[in-house]
Every structure is written in C-alpha cells, then in structure tokens.
Regions:
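Interfacial "coupling" helices/loops that link adjacent transmembrane helices in transporter permeases
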Residues: 16, 294-336, 683-721, 775, ...
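Mid-to-C-terminal secondary-structure elements
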Residues: 118-134, 147-275, 474-661
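Hydrophobic, regular-secondary-structure patches
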Residues: 44, 58-116, 123, 155-160, ...
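Small-residue-rich transmembrane alpha-helices
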Residues: 32, 36-39, 254, 335-401, ...
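Membrane-helix entry/capping segments
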Residues: 1-6, 10-11, 15, 19, ...
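Alpha-helical transmembrane segments of integral membrane proteins
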Residues: 1-24, 270-272, 302-339, 347-469, ...
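Hydrophobic alpha-helical transmembrane segments of multi-pass inner-membrane transport and secretion
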Residues: 15-41, 275-311, 339, 418-441, ...
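Membrane-proximal juxtamembrane linkers immediately C-terminal to transmembrane helices
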Residues: 42-63, 89, 131, 189-191, ...
Length: 791
C-alpha cells in the first residue's frame, strides 16, 4: 500500500512540474528559515543552562534606591561569598568569579599574550560544567601557584607540547604551574576567559582588599536541595548593611536564578522582567508564520488545481476507492513534497549558516552526528507535510463522483473565499514585517545620529599594563613628538565604559534621598577635554599642573547639575558620607554618552587622579597617513612597554557595538521579511498561473472582441491587488501596535511616521503587481485563435 501511494504521489508531482517546483521552493525556504531560527532559539534558551544543579544555582544581586526608583546590579564585594558560606547552612557551595582584575601578561619564553583571565574560587569546576581535557577539577585550583589554561591558550604558549606541569610567567613577576587544560568555552555562555587563577593568588597580591562597600565581582551560590530561595532572600537581604557602619550602605542582596540570567536581564523597579526572552518569543512567532505561509502556498495551489484533479477523484471513487485511501494518498503527496523540500532546506541551511552566524553574532552548528537531530528533523518535516496537505486532502477527497463525472462540479468559486483569506494572511504578515523593519532601522539610525558629546573619529585607546603606567609621560611625549598623535590624555576608564560609580554624596541643599543618587565616577588628567573634544559649558577643565587645588576639583556633567538642582555649580562643595577628600566643583561639561545611546545620560563626576589612571587615549594624526602614524604609535608603545603587545582599540568601533543588538534585530526582521515576501510571491505566481490557465477561453474571446493587453493584464491582476490592499489595511495597525510597544522601551525614540506605511504599501503593491503581471502578460499575449481552438 505504501509503495503504491508513493508511486502515485511521485507520478502526480512529476506530472505538474511547475506547481511542484513552486511548492518545493516555498517549503524549502520556509523550512530553512524555521531551522535557522530554531538553531538560534536553541542557543539562546540553552545559554548557561548546561551546568550541574542549574535549578539550584543563583547569582547574587544588589537592589538599591536611585533617583526615586529601585535599580539592580550584580557586582558584589569580596567578603560576601566567604561570609555566606560560613553563616548560611542552606547554602551548599559559594563561588566567586572576578573577570576584571586578572588581565595579566602570560608568557612562556618569547611568547607573550595580554589576554582575559579570571580569579575564581577552588570549587569553580564543581559548580560550572567546563570540562578539563587534562588535570583534576577538584585540585586544579587549590594552590596559589596554580593556573588553568584554555586549550587555545595552551597551544599558543606550548604548541603541540603537553602543557601540564609546565610553568608560565604572570606579568613578569610570578611563575604559575599549569594544573589543568580546559576545553575551549562554548558560544552559549556568559563566561569569557582564557585562563583561571585561584583566589589564593589574588589574596597574595591584594591581602587587605576586603571592603564590604567595594563590589567588583560576581558571587554564585548553590542552595541545598530542600532550601527555598524565598527564605534565603529573606535571610541574606541585609547582610551588607549588617557588615558596614550605620548609614554607610543601603543595598540589599537577593538571589537571581542563574538559568534566567541571560534571558531576563531588563529591570523595572528593581525586578527582572524581560530581556532577550522577548526576542526569543518574537522570532519563534516569525518562524511559525514563515512556515505557515509556506504551507498556505501548498494549500492554495492544491485547492486551485482541484478542478483538474476532480475527474481523477471521481474515477477512483467509482472504481471503489475509499475516501480514507484518497486522504492517505493526498497527504502522502504532501509528505513526499515536504521531504524533497526538507533535503533542499538542509542544503540551504548549510550554505547560509556561516553568513547567518555573522548576523546573529553566534557560533551555531548542526550536529549531524547526533541521531536525535535526524529524528527531530524528520518529525519536523513530516509534520510540516501533514500540516500543509491536511486541508487539501480532506477537500479533494470530498468530491462527489456523480457530479464530477457529469461535469456539473465547479469547485473554483466555492474555494474563492478561503483562498482569498489565506492570501490575505500571507501578505498581512509580510507587510507587517516590512513596516517593522523600516521602523527598527529608523530607531537605530536615530540613536546613531544622537550627539555623543565628543568626537570619535581617529580616537583610540590602550589599556595600561606593565610599564605603561610608569612610563606614561614618555609614551605621551613619544606619540606627540613623532607626529603619531595630535593629543594624548589618561583616564580611569575608556569613554565607552563605566568602571566605577557610587552614591552617598552630599552638598549644600541636598536631602536624604539625594544621598542615594548614583553617580558615574571618572578620573581624567588636564588633557582630557581637549583630546576628547568635550565642550566646557561653565568654569574650566581640570588642570592640576597650574592649579594645585584641582587634585580635589571635580567636573560635573549637565545631568549631575540637574539632578543636584545646582543653579551656580562652580564653587560648590561635595562631600562623601563615607569619608574621603572634599571635592569642589570647577566646571560643567556638556553631556557625553558613555552608556546606552538609547537611554538618558546619568549624573557623572570627573575628578583628577583620585581613582587612578588605567587608559591612555590618543587622537591619531591623519597627516600624512593614518596608517603610517598608527605604526609610529605602535613603535612608541613597544619602546616603553616592550613586554606587552600593542592592543589598540578604536572609539568609533567601540561605540558602534552599542547598536549591535538593535541592528541585529533589524537585519533579522528584514531578512525574514524578504523571505516571507519571496515565499508569498511564489504562491501568488502559482495562483496567477492557474487562474490564467483556467480562464484561457475567456481571455481568448476578450482578445478577439478587441480587448487590449493592458485590459487583460488589469483583469487578471485586480483581484490579487485587491487582496494585497486588504492585507495592507490589516497589517498596518498590527505593525503600529507592535512597534509602539517596542519603542516604549526607549526613552530616546523616533515617532512612527505615516510615510513608513505609505512606502510599505507602494512596495507591496509593486511586488504583487510585478509577480502577477508576468503570468497576466503571458496569457494576454498568447494567440487567442490557438487557445479557442484548443478549447
């Protein structure tokens, strides 16, 4: 029976090559799109969920008041972890992870690498599933003299030699023994490091750094099986307040399920409420709709050809075929077609996956060696085939043989309404996606064009390691005298990142709530404003060479002045409730963007050397050659900091990263909008071909009676264009509602303009007209005499 159905299905598909090709192409593109989206979704939802006891693993967070609301941050202090491990019996294991202070120069002989490392507690490998290729995970980090390397770093340092037991030099100071080689980290993890050092080594470097007010690491806890997170949160909430002086700290600790940390990162009033999970939901819907559109193509074309297949059904029923056997045959046809499309889809995915990975910024792969992949893929394809063929199978098998064979059965008119509905559904989704794409791209451009407050072109920076800090003046002199740079300044952090913030500041006229205001904190030297091209609005910039009191001088940005309600800020005195130097305001600088360009600028204090300098900023001279001067800069750094590579970064590129997520969304939505249009047009092309074929006698008569090619083309096109018009009317409010909700998350946002809908409508009409006109012109230009004779 199966063999007979297969043979009949294959024969039917080969007999109608055009419709089979259209169906296979549409389903293949739809399946490929769905597979790509599913790969991305699987990567997102599995992010850091592969660790043991993930349901009991939590990341500790702080919740504090700021500017009248609650905000959340996850950097915690060093003594927090040991205190929790000691005093909270419901906690099974505590692990600290410090990714900010372990960036050393790792050397083996003449091989030097300034790369990203992390300090971790001894039990790191018992909490996180990062397998060691060599070494014992229980003992690899139990000594201050140990180091664990990733496989990639081990190969860079030792080539093909076994790294285990060998020593590497850390910052030209200490020798560490390699006690583990770690399999390179997967793409679906938040952890980023090339080597791990034990906290015992950190304690050796910084023996007295146990300040409960200084948070710069992540603290993870694994609760015991019977412990509840609600009870733990209640007990741990005030631990920071209990270990600090009265009034010194206001932040409360709570535990966030780590399995949700990647997907739920947005905060509203102190609670995690959303984040990338919204993208997962959105692209899940897009995948479903794209597949649905491909299935609609199959349904429309199958039912459109019902008149031609009616006699086949009638004869088979007269010959004794049961309706159930006809249903099985028609569904078999759709499954066979889906299998062929599935093979094409796998090929499309394989060809496009590298480009797709670039767009989404991931390392997605298909594990062909996994038998479950093939099982799921086959089920997915078969279900798609069944879904696509179910309605046509039941409809075609319902024909009454007497009416069919007598010629009184006219199925086309009966099917017009459902077919129209399906076409409207297709184009509604496609038009909505196009509108969303235009608005997302507009929002990204709006943020990109927002005044950053400083000039980014030709501006670069190098983070100071090794001898760079000691030799800063020599490096600065070398950069300027060689002509490599036109200006040089040192700062505590890059202009695109926040490395320090704090509250507890009081000033004349401030109140209790003001002390909870969080300020971004930044150290800069006297060349800062000229190097960055900042605009000083009041007072002057920091110049502690000519003004000795500027060692405690502070520049405020406009946001800080507004938050502090200062009418005449220059000369105002600012004190910290926690002690430290008394600051005096020497100037006001125009707001400049450090954090998100989509969000309001936060209050900021810029001081002299109080927080220390960690970054050299320099503006590269364009004359006579940008590239030549960059090489000169490299020589200067190599001369005065020879042990460290010249790891230069550029502010225009660093700033562009801030738009990556929104640009990625816009690109993906645009890509799938184009694919949706393509699939819809395939179906429209097939329907137009069938309609032209079914009305061939009418067209011939009209041509003989004098109808022009334009008249015939308009006759065949107007019905489809009317459907596209209905789709536009339905899609526009849907797209407006979706985009209005999306834009509401951005304080700085565009308005949704009428022209977006007008352009989309014209584009949709043009695409539909071009698709239908191909078949309409072909029918109109055909010889009417030959068509009438054949009839």
């Amino acid at each position: 029976m199966f063999k007979i159905n297969f043979r009949l299905s294959l024969r039917s598909l080969l007999r109608h090559k055009l419709y089979s090709f259209i169906n296979v192409s549409g389903l293949a593109v739809g399946l490929a799109s769905a597979i790509l989206i599913c790969l991305w979704i699987q990567n997102e939802v599995s992010h850091d969920r592969f660790h043991p006891n993930i349901d009991r693993l939590y990341l500790l967070n702080n919740r504090d008041q700021n500017n009248g609301g609650l905000y959340v941050y996850n950097l915690t202090c060093r003594p927090l972890g040991p205190a929790i491990q000691k005093d909270y019996p419901e906690v099974e294991r505590v692990v600290r992870y410090d990714n900010g202070t372990a960036n050393f120069l790792i050397s083996n002989g003449d091989k030097h690498f300034s790369i990203n490392g992390s300090f971790v507690d001894t039990g790191f490998f018992s909490v996180f599933n990062f397998p060691l290729l060599e070494g014992n995970p229980s003992t690899a980090l139990n000594s201050a003299k140990n180091i664990v390397l990733t496989e990639q770093l081990a190969k860079k340092l030792f080539g093909n030699e076994d790294a285990m037991g060998k020593t590497v030099k850390v910052d030209s100071v200490d020798y560490q023994t390699v006690t583990g080689v770690l399999k390179d980290l997967p793409g679906n993890t938040n952890f980023k490091f090339d080597y791990l050092l034990p906290y015992a080594y950190y304690s050796k470097l910084y023996p007295n750094n146990n300040d409960w007010n200084n948070g710069n690491l992540l603290t993870f806890v694994t609760l015991k099986p019977k412990a509840t997170v609600a009870e733990f949160d209640r007990k741990v909430a005030n631990i920071i307040i209990e270990h600090t002086k009265p009034g010194e700290a206001t932040n409360k600790i709570f535990a966030q399920p780590y399995k949700d940390a990647w997907l739920y990162s947005n905060v509203e009033n102190g609670q995690y409420v959303g984040g990338r999970i919204e993208l997962v939901k959105m692209f899940s819907l897009i995948a479903i709709f794209i597949l649905l559109i491909a299935c609609i193509n199959f349904t429309n074309l199958s039912t459109a050809r019902s008149e031609k297949r009616a006699k086949e059904v009638g004869i088979r029923k007269v010959a004794g075929a049961l309706r159930s056997s006809l249903i099985v045959q028609f569904i078999s046809e759709s499954i066979l077609l889906a299998l062929v499309a599935g093979i094409g889809a796998v090929g499309i995915v394989q060809l496009t996956l590298p480009a797709f990975n670039k767009v989404v910024g991931s390392r997605l792969v298909i594990d062909y060696s996994n038998p479950w992949y093939w099982v799921y893929a086959l089920l997915f394809i078969v279900l798609t085939g069944v879904m696509a063929g179910l309605y046509p199978a039941f409809y075609l098998s319902s024909f009454q043989p007497v009416k069919v064979l007598k010629g009184s059965f006219k199925p086309v008119k009966a099917l017009l309404t459902p077919r129209k509905v399906l076409v409207v559904l297709q184009f509604t989704f496609a038009i909505a996606l196009i509108i969303c794409t235009i608005i997302v791209e507009g929002q990204v451009r709006f943020a990109q064009n927002r005044d950053a407050g400083y000039r980014r072109n030709n501006l670069a920076f190098v983070i100071m390691f090794g001898e760079a800090k000691k030799n800063y003046e020599l490096i600065k002199k070398g950069l300027l005298s060689s002509g490599a740079a036109t200006a040089v300044a040192q700062t505590s952090a890059p202009m695109t990142e926040i490395w320090a913030n704090g509250n507890g500041f009081v000033w004349k006229g401030s109140n209790t709530d003001d002390s909870k205001t969080n300020f971004n904190l930044y150290s800069a030297d006297k060349d800062f404003s000229t190097t960055m091209n900042l605009q000083i609005l009041q007072g002057r910039s920091i110049d502690y060479d000519n003004y000795k009191t500027d060692s405690t001088g502070v520049l405020l940005n406009e946001a800080a002045v507004n938050e502090m309600r200062l009418k005449n800020p220059v000369g105002e005195v600012i004190r910290s409730m926690y002690g430290g130097p008394v600051l005096h305001v020497i100037g006001v600088v125009k707001n400049f963007i450090i954090e998100s360009p989509y969000q309001p600028i936060n209050p900021m204090m810029i001081v002299g050397p109080i927080f220390g300098y960690s970054v050299i900023n320099f503006r590269i001279n364009e004359r006579p050659s940008y590239g030549e001067n960059l090489q000169k800069a490299e020589k200067v750094f190599s001369q005065y900091n020879p042990q460290y590579p010249f790891n230069v970064r550029f502010y225009d590129k660093e700033y562009a990263v801030k738009f990556a997520d929104e640009q990625r969304v816009g690109t993906l939505v645009g890509l799938f909008a184009a694919l949706t249009i393509f699939i819809s047009c395939l179906g429209l092309f097939g329907l137009a071909a069938y309609m032209a074929e079914s009305r061939i006698k009418e067209i011939g008569i009209r041509r003989v009676l004098g109808a022009s090619v334009t008249n015939i083309t308009g006759l065949l096109s107007k019905e489809f264009l009317r459907l596209v018009g209905i789709s536009f009317v339905v899609a526009s409010p849907i797209a407006w509602l979706v985009m209005h909700s999306w834009l509401a998350g951005y304080p700085y946002r565009i308005a949704i303009e009428w022209w977006v809908f007008a352009v989309t409508g014209v584009l949709a009409f043009f695409i539909a007209l071009a698709t239908v006109s191909v078949q309409a012109l072909r029918a109109a230009l055909a010889n009417p005499v030959r068509n009438l004779r054949s009839e």
